[in-house]
Amino acid sequence: MPLEFRAGYNEERPAGAKGATDSLGTQRPELLAAALGSYDDEGPRILRRMAKRGLTALGLAAIALALGSCALSAGDAPRSAYGPYARLGPPDAPVRLYYKEEGKGSPLLLIHGFGASTYTWRHIAPELARDHLVIAVDLKGFGQSDKPFDERYSVFDQADLLAQLIVDKNLRNLTLVGHSFGGGVALLLALRADPRLKGRISKLVLLDTIAYPQNVPVFFRLLDVPVVSQLGFSMVPPEVQTRVALRIAYFDNSKIDPDEIETYAAPLKTAAGKHAIIHSARQIVPDGLSELSERYGSIKIPTLILWCDHDRIVPLGVGLKLRRTLPNSTFRLVEDCGHMPQEEQPQATLKLIQAFLGG
C-alpha cells in the first residue's frame, strides 16, 4: 500500500524510503548527491566514455536535459495532422499552444514537465477522461506548440499563457495536474492574484515538482555557454542524448521503450526545438523562486503531493517540505519509481489521482 501523509501529522519516516526524513537537510544521501550533480555511477560512466571519444560537451548537454525533468518533447509534426490550438499571448507576439481534449465532467488541466509534452500522459489520460474533461497541453516550446526564437520560457511565462487558456476556455472547478517543471507552473497559477482566475482552481495535483531553489548541477550552467550548448547538440545523435536522459530519469531502465526514445528525440533534430530546450533549461530554477515559495502556505485548496521514492532529479525532501508547507495537502509515495510516475508507474499513479479526485 502506498504511504499517505496529511498535513499536520507527526514527522515520520515513510516506509520504503530508508534513511529519508522530511527535512531538506537530512534527505537520503543518494538523493542529496543527485541534487548536487553526482548521479550515482551512470552519468560519470557515460561522461568518461564520451570524453574518450572527444564528446564530453555532448555528454554534459545530454545529461543536463535529463535533469530538468524526464524526457524530451515529442517532435514537430505537420499542423494539419493535429489540433486544436489555442492562440495565446499578446497580439503582437501570439503563441499557439497545442492541446488534447477528451471526456466530460469537471476539468483537469495536465501540465507536463521540462522537455516533455502531452505524450507523457498517454498512460493515464484516457482513464481520467472517463469521469472528467481532460485537457493536456503542450507548453510553449514543446510538443506541437510554437517554439519561437525568444527567451520567454520561464515558469512565469508559461503560467501567463495557461492563465489565458483557462479564462478563454472558461474552465471552472478546475484541477491542475503538474509534473516537475509543470508542477511549478501549477503552483504559480494557484498563487496568482489574477482576478480572472478567482474561484476557478479547486484542486492541485503535484508530481515530483520543482518548488524550491536547489543546487543546479554543472551541466545546466554549461548550457549558459553558447558554444558548449550548441556543440553538445551537434556532436551526438539525438537518440543517444535521449537515451542518457531517460536512464537518469527512470528507476527501472528495462521499462524504457524504444518507441519512447524515438518520439522524445525528434525535437532535437530541429533548430527551434533545440532553442526551446536550451532557453527553458537556463530558467529551470527562476530568479525569485525563494520569495515565491514563502507564499506556498497561502494555498488552501486540497492538494495531492505525489512523489517517487527514487527521484534523482527533484529529491524526495522537496515533496516532504511541500507537504509540511501546504496546509490542506496529502502526500503519497510511489514505490520503485524515478522521476516520472505517470510513465514508469502509471497504474499506481492513476489510482492515487483517482482516489484524490473522488474524495
Task: Describe these PLM feature segments.
Residues 84, 90-93, 98-102, 136-181, ...:
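Active-site loop/oxyanion-hole signature of alpha/beta-hydrolase fold enzymes
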Residues 260, 315-322:
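Short alpha-helix in the alpha/beta-hydrolase fold that links the catalytic acid
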Residues 329-359:
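Catalytic active-site module of serine/aspartate enzymes centered on a nucleophile-bearing elbow/loop
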Residues 299, 305-307:
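Short beta-strand/loop motif that positions the catalytic acidic residue
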Residues 310-314:
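Acidic catalytic loop of the alpha/beta-hydrolase fold
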Residues 172-215:
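Conserved hydrolase catalytic core segment
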Residues 101-144:
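Conserved HGGG/HGGXW glycine-rich cap/lid loop of the alpha/beta-hydrolase fold
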Residues 220-221, 235-297:
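Conserved alpha/beta-hydrolase catalytic His-Asp/Glu region
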